[in-house]
Amino acid sequence: MSRWTGAIGVGLSAGLSGALCLAASSLLGSLLQPNSLGWSGLVRMATLVIWPWSDDGHPLPNFLVALAIVLVVPVILVAPAARETAAGRGGYTMMWATWGAVLVAGALAGAAAVGIAAAASPGSSGFDVLPSGLQAGAGWALLVGWIPALIAAGVHAGRLRQVD
């Protein structure tokens, strides 16, 4: 197995698990009412974009763009790191590299989602809401980014055993 083949597999596992986390947190955020049970802060932070098919959901383009960014950016950033990580030093390195990649992806996805929403409203500028989108995306990634990080580290550890 080529080093790039395994590395792309690690990147895909990071991207797919990040996209699944985004979809799951969006669905959960739309199912839980933010003001009920005192969960408002946690639900708001764990939800990057609201599930588009809920009553109070964002338009579908917000969700799809955020999902595409969270899927593609970790693949682009994690695959080269997985290729260059040496055997025996892979677990923590891949975990932190993936968490950082998900953090970048979350910030970009949050900025894109609020930018699309701002473009749809006539009185708002995309540059005015960009910091809040970056903050929301980074907060989401800090809260749930460990899940794709652990999955990618596990896939990477299994890949190292196969190569050696």
Report residues per predicted region.
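Hydrophobic alpha-helical transmembrane segments
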Residues: 7-12, 61-84, 95-100, 110
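Long, glycine/tryptophan/cysteine-rich extracytoplasmic
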Residues: 12-69, 124-136
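Hydrophobic core segments of alpha-helical transmembrane domains in multi-pass membrane transport
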Residues: 14-22, 73, 118, 146-151
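Transmembrane helix-loop junctions in multipass membrane proteins, especially transporters and channels
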Residues: 30-34, 82, 86-87, 118-122, ...
